[in-house]
Amino acid sequence: QHLKEAFPQAAILIVSVGDRDYKTEEGELRTMPGIKNLVRYQQNLAADEAVAFWNMFEAMGGEGSMADMVHAKPSLANYDYTHINFRGGKHLAGLLYESLIYGKEQYDRRRAYYEEEP
């Protein structure tokens, strides 16, 4: 809310947290217990404040995706199962860019449709 008041003409995009894994007592990698709740909270906050939201957790592949990024060839994330690396950042940046372009195209189509109506 403070940012919207301070910069009323600015477009605001909330990017959710990504996946983050931990090892269970059995040694299995799992998404940390609070990640999905945090993503939902961020999504609700964006909706409540009428700002854009991009779900990086889902863009990464959802639950367990951090391990997939770590073990990708070449690796897209670090072996701490928390942080993406440069290649992973470049990959996710491309996905965000595609989402923004798609959203702009949909906006332009809707706008053209409503401008055509009598």
Predicted ranges, named:
Residues 14-15:
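Structural beta-sheet core signal
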